[in-house]
């Protein structure tokens, strides 16, 4: 599938679901497509997440390397968005696997980030800052 076909498919797929998208709804719908070995679910999902994140990085790298005219740039951004969707799927399935709803992870992450911002510790490294 070439880049233009991939972009068209992504846009068509976006139009199928018309409900308001929530993390809970996404997690439920995504889990209906989950086919992987349940006895190694955590490992499988973590490796899948890493693989898909690598695909995002690869597409961004090629965009930087090759440059693009405006039309090609927009198509490549759509392809990147499609890969981000795959990353999201793995995040949702990992959340399900560890037994914490995705929306709770999202809320907790925002609380953590806002706390760091208020304390001036967004920069730096380490989980406990």
What are these regions (language model features)?
Residues 1-84, 88-129:
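Flexible "arm" and connector segments at domain edges
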């Amino acid at each position: 599938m070439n880049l233009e076909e991939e972009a068209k498919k992504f846009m068509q797929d976006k139009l199928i679901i018309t409900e308001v998208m929530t993390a809970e709804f996404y997690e439920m719908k995504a889990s209906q497509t989950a086919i992987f070995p349940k006895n190694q679910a955590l490992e499988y999902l973590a490796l899948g997440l890493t693989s898909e994140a690598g695909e995002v990085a690869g597409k961004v790298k090629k965009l930087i390397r090759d440059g693009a005219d405006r039309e090609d740039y927009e198509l490549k951004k759509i392809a990147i968005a499609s890969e981000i969707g795959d990353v999201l799927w793995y995040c949702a399935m990992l959340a399900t696997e560890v037994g914490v709803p995705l929306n709770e992870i999202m809320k907790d992450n925002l609380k953590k980030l806002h706390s760091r911002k208020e304390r001036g510790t967004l920069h730096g490294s380490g989980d406990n800052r």
